């Protein structure tokens, strides 16, 4: 094992990729608040370099954490000493990354049309942006591309607009990939874009939606982070901005919105995966959406898509006070989840962010809801932790297909219940 580790580290140095040989993902089961607090203490020990995939929220909710090889025994000993049970969900993270790379390398042929594009594999930013351009070229009467800004590192932030005409019509916003390592979301976003062009004029529900509203789809919401996951660190979550006074890079773009910014549910530590940034909208990736939504002024539904955990969430994240539209949002979430489950039997839970998972301040949909966008939802796609952020490419299309049924339900309701 030691020889393998040395070889892997040398290869990583040559190719620039961070190595995860021997890293394990543990599922921790905290049975009471005291055990949850112990895990939180573990989380604060930065020298352990733990990467929490599912945070310690409250007793009874699973906690998933990636543990580097050098600290795995210390972490297990800590848990065992405090009688906190755990199981190994992923034995070796690098082996899954190697499988992922091998699968991607087998499908590297450049598509000359969106029909030839491979929707059952993961793609780079350049490939996704080329796909977007192809889609616009093939469907100029339905699809256009808008650049709403540029990233910290200077990449374009592109959004697809699906419209049957008119100006400033009521609209629906969908974004995927705000957390860069959640690859199944960007892949699903690509599939959604193609699905819209295939179904308009053929499928009555989508046709009625687009005859009444525009759809904006941002497939890669965090381009810098996404490129970094491909070139350097597959597990990168945040943006790539620099924080003055810290060597740690990036901000959690789902804690950077001007909705209870700085309250519990986000971190002030620049090295944390949930670092909120120095001020609201500090990240250009967030500010670009804020400016677009504000200037548009007629967005009626806002749907932000993440992975993993199989959840459909609505406001609030920062307070347990029920949202004014909680009853309607809850019923709509139930209908959307029912539609999703009907295809492949995938089970989703639904509810407000704070009641269903944890307290989160500065989140996307708390801000959009505060701007009067009633139908504000966050999805957490497959799975529930068996593979986590490393979902096999074979699950991309089934994930996108079932999620689309939930999206259709929300969009159809939005059209039929104007406000």
Curated annotation (Swiss-Prot):
Its cofactor is Zn(2+). Gene3D superfamilies: Metallocarboxypeptidase-like, Zn peptidases. GO terms for biological process: proteolysis involved in protein catabolic process; response to cadmium ion. Residues 1-16 form the signal peptide. Monomer. Belongs to the peptidase M14 family. This is Carboxypeptidase A1. The gene is Cpa1.
């Amino acid at each position: 094992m030691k020889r393998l580790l040395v070889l892997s580290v040398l290869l990583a140095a040559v190719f620039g990729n961070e190595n995860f040989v021997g890293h394990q993902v543990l599922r921790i089961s905290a049975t009471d608040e005291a055990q949850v607090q112990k895990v939180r203490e573990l989380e604060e020990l930065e020298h352990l370099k733990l990467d929490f995939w599912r945070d310690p929220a409250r007793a009874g909710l699973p906690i998933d954490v990636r543990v580097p090889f050098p600290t795995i025994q210390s972490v297990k000993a800590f848990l065992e000493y405090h009688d906190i049970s755990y199981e190994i969900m992923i034995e070796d993270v690098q082996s899954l990354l190697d499988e992922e790379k091998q699968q991607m390398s087998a499908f590297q042929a450049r598509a000359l049309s969106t029909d030839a594009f491979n929707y059952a594999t993961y793609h780079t930013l350049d490939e996704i942006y080329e796909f977007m351009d192809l889609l616009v070229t093939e469907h100029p009467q339905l699809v256009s591309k808008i650049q709403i800004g540029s990233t910290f590192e200077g990449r374009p932030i592109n959004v697809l607009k699906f419209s049957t005409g008119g100006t400033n019509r009521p609209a629906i916003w969908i974004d995927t990939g705000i957390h860069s390592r959640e690859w199944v979301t960007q892949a699903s976003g690509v599939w959604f874009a193609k699905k819209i062009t295939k179904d308009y004029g053929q499928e009555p529900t989508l046709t009625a939606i687009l005859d009444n509203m525009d759809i904006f789809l941002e497939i890669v919401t965090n381009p810098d982070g996404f490129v970094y996951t491909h070139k350097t660190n597959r597990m990168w979550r945040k943006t790539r901005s620099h924080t003055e006074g810290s060597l740690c890079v990036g901000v959690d773009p789902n804690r950077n919105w001007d909705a209870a910014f700085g309250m519990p549910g986000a971190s002030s530590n620049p090295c944390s995966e949930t670092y909120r940034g120095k001020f609201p909208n500090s990240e250009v990736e967030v500010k670009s959406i804020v400016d677009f939504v504000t200037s548009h002024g007629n967005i009626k539904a806002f749907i932000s898509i993440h992975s993993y955990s199989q959840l459909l969430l609505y406001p609030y994240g920062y307070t347990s006070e029920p949202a004014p539209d909680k009853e309607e949002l809850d019923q709509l979430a139930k209908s959307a989840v029912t539609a999703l489950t009907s295809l492949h039997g995938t089970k989703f839970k639904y509810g407000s962010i704070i009641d269903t998972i944890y307290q989160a301040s500065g989140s996307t949909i708390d801000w959009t809801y505060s701007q009067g966008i009633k139908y504000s939802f966050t999805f957490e796609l497959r799975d529930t932790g068996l593979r986590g952020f490393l979902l096999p490419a074979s699950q991309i299309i089934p994930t996108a297909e079932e999620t689309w049924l939930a999206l259709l339900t929300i969009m159809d309701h939005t059209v039929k219940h104007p406000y």
